[in-house]
């Protein structure tokens, strides 16, 4: 197999250890067959690698490539008109009566072909790739009928065939109750969400199962019925939970050994402790908090107290978080929620990988996937510090320039 040596760089390996960021000011890295074979101080490079083809990275910063672990980039239409309506004083109910809200996105998504869904998603994905992202989680959930949910997942899978990025799909059939099932959430779960999940799994379209546990969406017992099927199918789970109220969704997710609970603004200490016991990751989504002008913040201090890993993501979606910048999400997590820059970078590398169950991503330790982001900055704190500035020099995927 071809070896590649990357040297003359500042390495932020993001491994656990005594040094913040796993930082090595004069580092080097050897890749082979898509994996990190060796990383460490350049002065300690083993002699066996002396003749390996070398790439001088000009003293730039190298981190693991970024991971956006919670997105809705596949959808039809946009909701810019609602943004304007709200700023002109329209209430949520007035927007909904005018055909807005999730109903608008569901309608636009149901009428879009798979090719159209893919074509509209690719520019969003390109914006993420341009900021050093190598893994993107993509959810369904804007079809809310069997065929459209499948079409969304097929379009998500197709992204990975058109771009050099790893796609992880999440089935989100339990996202909202569609208008044609108004007042019949149980019937929707039984006749649409669960059959769609079984069919999508049979087609190999599902990497994980998600849901939205909230008063405006589904109750814990309804989510549990979907999770029972996910468990029977051997699929990992995650959950939108405690965003607008505390319904106990996080405790439910913990009882199923879920990978993550996402949003969690209203999570209490009992829920945090349940996450810790279950080994879950907390996914922080500052874009939605900002866009919705929320005031209840995620319990960051409690998450630290109970040592629950925190991931950070864009929540890219047409309604509550119309953003694709993971660097901006990092800055927001620091500014709005008081994460440290190191926590923010861990949240888009090591802990984002945990949130997706990807044990081979997120650090630059030997045996990890050699997906690198090379930055024109001197220190990793600069990635979360600057706003509206993209210092990416290049991505290196699988150790290949």
From Swiss-Prot:
Record's Pfam families? Answer: Amidohydro_1 (PF01979)
A single GO cellular-component term on record = cytoplasm
Q: Which reaction does it catalyse?
A: 4-imidazolone-5-propanoate + H2O = N-formimidoyl-L-glutamate
Record GO biological process: L-histidine catabolic process to glutamate and formamide; L-histidine catabolic process to glutamate and formate
Query: What's noted on cofactor binding?
Result: Binds 1 zinc or iron ion per subunit.
Instruction: Look at the named UniProt entry and state the broad enzyme category this protein falls under.
Output: hydrolase
Binding locations of N-formimidoyl-L-glutamate: 142, 317, 319
The record ties this protein, via InterPro entries, to: Amidohydro-rel (IPR006680), HutI (IPR005920), Metal-dep_hydrolase_composite (IPR011059), Metal_Hydrolase (IPR032466)
- Hey, which pathway is this one from? Amino-acid degradation; L-histidine degradation into L-glutamate; N-formimidoyl-L-glutamate from L-histidine: step 3/3
GO MF term (any one):
imidazolonepropionase activity
Positions that bind Fe(3+): 70, 72, 240, 315
Give UniProt keywords alphabetically. Cytoplasm, Histidine metabolism, Hydrolase, Iron, Metal-binding, Zinc
Q: What is its EC number?
A: 3.5.2.7
> Which residues does the annotation say bind Zn(2+)?
70, 72, 240, 315
Q: For 4-imidazolone-5-propanoate, which residues are the binding ones?
A: 79, 142, 175, 243, 320
Q: So which cofactors does this thing need? A: Zn(2+); Fe(3+)
**Location(s) in or outside the cell:** Cytoplasm
Which NCBIfam families does its entry note? hutI
As for what it does, the entry says: Catalyzes the hydrolytic cleavage of the carbon-nitrogen bond in imidazolone-5-propanoate to yield N-formimidoyl-L-glutamate. It is the third step in the universal histidine degradation pathway.
Q: Spell out the HAMAP family in the cross-references.
A: HutI
Family designation: Belongs to the metallo-dependent hydrolases superfamily. HutI family.
User: What is the name attached to this protein's record?
Assistant: Imidazolonepropionase
Organism for this UniProt entry: Ruegeria pomeroyi (strain ATCC 700808 / DSM 15171 / DSS-3)
Name the gene behind this protein: hutI
